[in-house]
Amino acid sequence: MNAYPWLEIPRTVRFSDTDAAGVMHFQHLLGWCHQAWEDSLEQFGIPVGAVFPGGRSDQPSVALPIVHCHADFRAPMYVGDAAVIHLLPKRIDPGCFEVVSEISLNTQKVASGCLQHLAIDAVTRQRCSLPEPIERWIEASTLGQIQPL
């Protein structure tokens, strides 16, 4: 078990995640990555309404659009498979970060995905610093790791 439980998200492959061949469809992997990030924020204590627009609370002043993503499959995932998504957040610069998601079945790494986000002012759409709750989440998630200068 990880010392940071908000970075390990369990997920089961559902029938709706699979294609006609009975394996996980490629498009669902990035959706899993984003949903795991949302779950992680909530487990850490950050309400998703404070980060994502469209909720019932005040709208966030900073938007975090995805500016780059990629995914890799290493082995098939079938309906009913119980996976664990391990999140590896990393600050790229004061206004940009990425979250790598490593998906495992038991101890076998079967897939990975990466979502890179850029912070922009929600009104002006100009680049800005990451919001404080995201800074805290990244900082807490990388404690004890060597970070590049």
Swiss-Prot record:
Catalytic residues of the enzyme: D19
InterPro entries to which the protein is assigned, alphabetical: DHNA_CoA_hydrolase, HotDog_dom_sf
One Pfam short name: 4HBT_2
Reaction catalysed by this enzyme: 1,4-dihydroxy-2-naphthoyl-CoA + H2O = 1,4-dihydroxy-2-naphthoate + CoA + H(+)
Key words, A-Z: Hydrolase
Matches recorded under SUPFAM superfamilies: Thioesterase/thiol ester dehydrase-isomerase (SSF54637)
One GO-annotated biological process of the protein: phylloquinone biosynthetic process
Keyword Hydrolase tagged: yes
Pathway where it operates: Cofactor biosynthesis; phylloquinone biosynthesis; Quinol/quinone metabolism; 1,4-dihydroxy-2-naphthoate biosynthesis; 1,4-dihydroxy-2-naphthoate from chorismate: step 7/7
Keyword Hydrolase: yes
Record EC number: 3.1.2.28
MF (Gene Ontology): 1,4-dihydroxy-2-naphthoyl-CoA thioesterase activity
Family to which the UniProt record says this protein belongs: Belongs to the 4-hydroxybenzoyl-CoA thioesterase family. DHNA-CoA hydrolase subfamily.
Protein function: Catalyzes the hydrolysis of 1,4-dihydroxy-2-naphthoyl-CoA (DHNA-CoA) to 1,4-dihydroxy-2-naphthoate (DHNA), a reaction involved in phylloquinone (vitamin K1) biosynthesis.
HAMAP family noted in UniProt: DHNA_CoA_hydrolase (MF_02101)
Protein name: 1,4-dihydroxy-2-naphthoyl-CoA hydrolase
